[in-house]
């Protein structure tokens, strides 16, 4: 069993929508609702904690009225950074040994990914899902290529990411004490010297970040319904 944490206080500036991108629609339904419905199917998910911008609480509560989910969803105050939101949410976790942290803007997560991440977290204490990098990666400085990076060992990391609760708390507290800001929760665990297991993600498991992603998401949903 696990508790799901969704940091949902971000502004989504790259989307340029003027509002939280989680409220944007895919096939007439808000992105966050698609995501919640995906986890609703997972029996191992005990409850859901969403770290939100307090000003948006009425909008989230209205969504839950319009699109109810059976699992318990708790809204808590998010932080200035995604990392702060996850840390705040951890303070409300109880009764489970593991948490999964997931981007609310990844609505195409599958039950297999959830289970694989949880299993790997039980084995290693921390886990991520990832896919091989397909494009050539180059390091660029001041507009000039300085290195072509060997991509055979590179992975594009996704969510969900799974953790034992004590380990993730330790990693967050250490980062907080050192004013360290990581790019994801797994990077905080790496920082304290712990292993992070890796399981297979999916190229369908996109994070809806730009207007182009919305079009791709609509296409994915259309394919799923066929």
UniProtKB/Swiss-Prot annotation:
Top EC group: transferase
Keyword Lipoprotein attached: no
Function noted in UniProt: Catalyzes the formation of 4-diphosphocytidyl-2-C-methyl-D-erythritol from CTP and 2-C-methyl-D-erythritol 4-phosphate (MEP).
Pathway, per record: Isoprenoid biosynthesis; isopentenyl diphosphate biosynthesis via DXP pathway; isopentenyl diphosphate from 1-deoxy-D-xylulose 5-phosphate: step 2/6
GO molecular function, one term: 2-C-methyl-D-erythritol 4-phosphate cytidylyltransferase activity
Catalytic reaction equation(s): 2-C-methyl-D-erythritol 4-phosphate + CTP + H(+) = 4-CDP-2-C-methyl-D-erythritol + diphosphate
CDD domains in alphabetical order: CDP-ME_synthetase
Family: Belongs to the IspD/TarI cytidylyltransferase family. IspD subfamily.
EC number assigned by the record: 2.7.7.60
Sites annotated Positions MEP for the nucleophilic attack: 151, 207
UniProt protein name: 2-C-methyl-D-erythritol 4-phosphate cytidylyltransferase
Site (Transition state stabilizer): 14, 21
Domain of life: Bacteria
GO biological process terms on file: isopentenyl diphosphate biosynthetic process, methylerythritol 4-phosphate pathway
PROSITE patterns: ISPD (PS01295)
Keywords assigned: Isoprene biosynthesis, Nucleotidyltransferase, Transferase
Record keyword Transferase present: yes
């Amino acid at each position: 069993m696990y508790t799901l944490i969704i940091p949902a206080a971000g502004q989504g500036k790259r989307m340029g929508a003027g509002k939280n991108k989680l409220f944007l629609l895919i096939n007439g339904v808000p992105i966050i609702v698609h995501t919640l419905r995906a986890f609703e199917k997972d029996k191992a998910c005990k409850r859901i904690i969403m770290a939100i911008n307090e000003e948006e609480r009425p909008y989230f509560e209205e969504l839950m009225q319009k699109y109810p989910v059976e699992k318990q969803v708790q809204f808590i105050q998010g932080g200035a950074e995604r990392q702060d939101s996850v840390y705040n949410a951890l303070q409300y976790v109880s009764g489970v040994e593991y948490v999964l942290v997931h981007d609310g803007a990844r609505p195409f997560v599958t039950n297999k990914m959830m289970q694989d991440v949880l299993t790997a977290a039980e084995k290693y204490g921390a886990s991520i899902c990832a896919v091989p990098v397909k494009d050539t990666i180059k390091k660029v400085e001041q507009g000039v290529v300085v290195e072509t990076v060997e991509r055979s060992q590179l992975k594009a990391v996704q969510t969900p990411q799974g953790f034992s609760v004590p380990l993730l708390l330790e990693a967050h507290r250490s980062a907080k004490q050192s004013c360290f800001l990581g790019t994801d929760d797994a990077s905080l665990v790496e920082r304290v010297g712990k292993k992070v297991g890796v399981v297979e993600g999916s190229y369908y498991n996109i994070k809806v970040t730009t207007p182009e992603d919305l079009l791709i998401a609509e296409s994915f949903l259309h394919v799923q319904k066929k």
